[in-house]
Regions:
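Start-transfer (signal-anchor) and selected internal transmembrane alpha helices
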Residues: 1-37
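Short hydrophobic/aromatic helix or loop-helix immediately within or flanking a transmembrane segment
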Residues: 57-63, 72-103
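Transmembrane-helix motifs of polytopic, lipid-linked glycan transferases
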Residues: 105-127
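Juxtamembrane "helix-exit" motif on the non-cytosolic side of transmembrane helices
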Residues: 118-122, 141-150
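Membrane-embedded helix bundles of polyisoprenyl
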Residues: 130-146
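Specific aromatic-rich, kink-prone transmembrane helix
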Residues: 156-175
Length: 175
């Protein structure tokens, strides 16, 4: 049936029934688009990057001084494993490239956390793949403080989103 012959409700129903023929490739394209959207929410983090709060003073400096030993060092009473791992990798880069690396790593963590919703494990909860794409977009676009957006400080927040989504997901079909 040509597209012009379908009613609006039929087109909406078709969107709801959409299932990608290549789910992994489709998810990768959607996550890549999400990365671009994440970066466009605060372009100054990429065009004029800088270290924010603990990013430089705590994570980066301690990574330089203590090396990988800083990864398991608590800060303010709890471990910051992922931010410290990112800082450990960033400590091998020139100082001028470190803030940009931190911003890109933070964006990758954000879209990866939200990208979990695209998994087949969410089919029982949200059967429509199109609806899962919408939820992915809504998670990425949720309002938050711009000053910590695309910084290592926001990484733990995105880990919380990933943990919450993992709790909602269906059990994996393979081990």
């Amino acid at each position: 049936v040509p597209k012009g012959d379908l009613s609006r409700s039929d087109r909406i129903r078709q969107l709801g029934e959409f299932q990608p023929s290549h789910p992994i490739l489709t998810a990768c394209v959607i996550v890549a688009a999400g990365f671009v959207v994440e970066c466009l929410r605060r372009p100054s983090a990429l065009t004029d990057p800088g270290l924010y709060a603990e990013d430089g003073v705590i994570f980066w400096l301690q990574s330089l001084s203590a090396g990988l030993g800083s990864v398991l060092q608590p800060y303010n009473g709890y471990l910051h494993l992922l931010p410290r791992l990112i800082a450990a990798v960033g400590s091998w880069l020139p100082l001028a490239a470190t803030p940009l690396f931190f911003a890109c790593a933070s964006a990758i963590v954000a879209v990866s956390a939200c990208g979990l919703i695209l998994s087949k494990r969410f089919s029982p909860l949200i059967p429509s793949y199109f609806a899962r794409i919408v939820v992915f977009g809504l998670l990425l676009l949720m309002p938050r403080l711009t000053e910590v957006h695309l910084s290592l400080n926001s990484v733990l927040w995105w880990c919380g989103v990933a943990l919450f989504l993992s709790c909602l997901a269906d059990d994996p079909s393979t081990n």
